UniProtKB/Swiss-Prot annotation:
Gene3D superfamilies: Aldolase class I. One of its GO terms (biological process) is lysine biosynthetic process via diaminopimelate. The record marks 46, 109 as: Part of a proton relay during catalysis. HAMAP family: DapA (MF_00418). This is 4-hydroxy-tetrahydrodipicolinate synthase. The gene is dapA.
Amino acid sequence: MSRLFEGVGVALTTPFTNNEIDYEALEKHVDYLLNNNIQSIVVNGTTAENPTLSDEEKDEVLKAVVKQVDGRVPVIAGTGTNATKKSLEASLRAKEIGADAIMLITPYYNKTSQRGLVAHFTTIADAVGLPVVLYNVPSRTNMTIDVDTMVELAKNPFIVAIKDATNDFDYHNKLKERLDLSDFSLYSGNDDNVVRYFAEGGNGVISVVANAIPGDFQALYEKSKRGEAIDKDFEPISRLLNALSVDVNPIPIKALTAVEGFGNYEVRLPLVTLESSDRKQLEEAYAKYKAGEL
């Protein structure tokens, strides 16, 4: 069996206009990503402001993206919650809508044990029967998938990838050593570490900044896959990422997607948009980046 997923996936933002989902902007954004050859789209994840979307909104966004993509790249639906029953229900709806895979975050707030993680993920994976990408992001959940647990979970035929947002290369290298990477994918969940991640055997990235610069990130991956050095190519992207670090994701990236015409610059509470001075500085940095001057 070969790996199902690799390359640049985009953690899609949800465009709003007057606090409602802007489906016209969503369609434009998806076309922009596809025209720049990204290799998968993740819908309803952290960057999509998942907690502020109703179940109906999540389903409608997924329907719109699945229709727009029309089989050209895999669509991965973020369906994980901190309740197994709710996650399973969302995953089954995603399957019915036409998602190619689901992404499951580790349960948060009501943290479980490593045994509980195995039970949670395998219950959903076995019942849904779609490829599963696990999402390990301890900075947001205060919970991690231990290496031994990941090895056990990878025995499940439906669990085919991990989005690793630990930024821990000891963890990454242990996974690389112990998993069969002929049919399992290691995705970085951190834009800022991709040079090293690709060099040390990572199969791709699920990117935030690629919402705005998909072509540049895809070119970076393709160059790395050819065995070419990408350090210099990454330097201006790194400076753009520094500018984006002004606030928590997805507040800054949505300022850039607004510049590109994908909805207004809006986020839903409890998130708030950047202060006007910070937004101005970020947009100036982005303009310099696009002009090749950053």
